Curated annotation (Swiss-Prot):
Gene3D superfamilies: Histone, subunit A (1.10.20.10), Leucine Aminopeptidase, subunit E, domain 1 (3.40.220.10). Keywords: Acetylation, Chromatin regulator, Chromosome, DNA-binding, Isopeptide bond, Methylation, Nucleosome core, Nucleus, Phosphoprotein, Ubl conjugation. Belongs to the histone H2A family. This is Core histone macro-H2A.1. Widely expressed. It comes from Homo sapiens.
Length: 369
């Protein structure tokens, strides 16, 4: 009761407040009824619609904020919203036909156009190291007749090997140069922002890139396959640099990355990363985070090239196919969200034929996506 005996006015609670959402439920109901006058609309339909729209908006804003942060901007713009949608697979499928005003476009450069610009026809030519020049033999120096059959056999083997390399490489790729003399680039893919991914058959300790990635554990263990190779090439100086980094950095957390100088190696830096173990909680998400942290460190150093082994598929137990898919997804996602990366070339340094086949196959799918 009021002071004069009248009834106290009751504040009207909106449908949105009753449902616990911010978006206007009443307006949603009007929109639904406007388009479907013949049908009965349930009470929960506009509430559910408002809740879904509210969730999608919050998700897009969070991803757009991350894109703005990566670009070192203090304000979210339509461009960042476009990048947020493009960076998320589900949102990209949902909003595929939606145009975001003032958002710009994501360039989609076909490999054929890039190939024409370079003066080639867009076909892959696997680079095979030419054999050393043979010395001219005098007429008196002739091989015995009995050894001719062996020579033919060797020629057949070399031809067969070259054919296998050509088949392994994807047909719509182009190759330009190698990370080091004497190594074979089996396949190359160009991302839409110009970065190149190359599958290389070589020894990672001999790769001439700005940085090589060393999968390790919490204590910077260098006894793994890649660590042993780097230790043999880098020697005592490399080991001392790793020990100094361990003292300075402390334990390396899962998905973390730290950088040391590449003493005794063709690479300027070595990026040590602690990849997750297959079967652990959120192991797939953590492997993607590991790759992105390695790329972020390379960007901090303004490096132009980085060489990855097959992270996670060794002692950590990831299936090779799964590891390749996650690594390629993380790299593609990183370049989409960063936009201003100094990295121009990413090498996948592999040795066994199974890993090579998997990476060539998965890289070929990037164009389709």
């Amino acid at each position: 009761m009021s002071s004069r005996g009248g009834k106290k006015k009751s504040t009207k609670t909106s449908r949105s407040a009753k449902a616990g959402v911010i978006f206007p439920v009443g307006r949603m109901l009007r929109y639904i009824k406007k388009g479907h006058p013949k049908y009965r609309i349930g009470v929960g339909a506009p509430v559910y619609m408002a809740a879904v729209l509210e969730y999608l908006t919050a998700e897009i804003l969070e991803l757009a904020g991350n894109a703005a942060r990566d670009n070192k901007k203090g304000r979210v713009t339509p461009r960042h919203i476009l990048l947020a949608v493009a960076n998320d697979e589900e949102l990209n499928q949902l909003l595929k036909g939606v145009t975001i005003a003032s958002g710009g476009v994501l360039p989609n450069i076909h490999p054929e156009l890039l190939a024409k610009k370079r003066g080639s026809k867009g076909k892959l030519e696997a680079i095979i190291t030419p054999p050393p020049a043979k010395k001219a033999k005098s007429p008196s120096q002739k091989k015995p007749v009995s050894k001719k059959a062996g020579g033919k056999k060797g020629a057949r083997k070399s031809k067969k090997k070259q054919g296998e390399v050509s088949k392994a490489a994807s047909a719509d790729s182009t190759t330009e140069g190698t990370p080091a003399d004497g190594f074979t680039v089996l396949s190359t893919k160009s991302l839409f922002l110009g970065q190149k991914l190359q599958v290389v058959q070589a020894d990672i300790a001999s790769i001439d890139s700005d940085a090589v990635v060393h999968p390790t554990n919490t204590d910077f263990y260098i006894g793994g396959e890649v660590g042993n190779t780097l230790e043999k090439k880098g020697g005592k100086e490399f080991v001392e640099a790793v020990l100094e980094l361990r003292k300075k950095n402390g334990p390396l957390e899962v998905a973390g990355a730290a950088v040391s100088a590449g003493h005794g190696l063709p690479a300027k830096f070595v990026i040590h990363c602690n990849s997750p173990v297959w079967g652990a909680d959120k192991c797939e998400e953590l492997l993607e985070k590991t790759v992105k942290n390695c790329l972020a460190l390379a960007d901090d150093k303004k490096l132009k090239s980085i060489a990855f082994p097959s992270i996670g598929s060794g002692r950590n137990g990831f299936p090779k196919q799964t590891a390749a898919q996650l690594i390629l997804k993380a790299i593609s996602s990183y370049f989409v969200s960063t936009m201003s990366s100094s990295i121009k070339t990413v090498y996948f340094v592999l040795f066994d034929s199974e890993s090579i086949g998997i990476y060539v196959q998965e890289m070929a799918k990037l164009d389709a996506n």
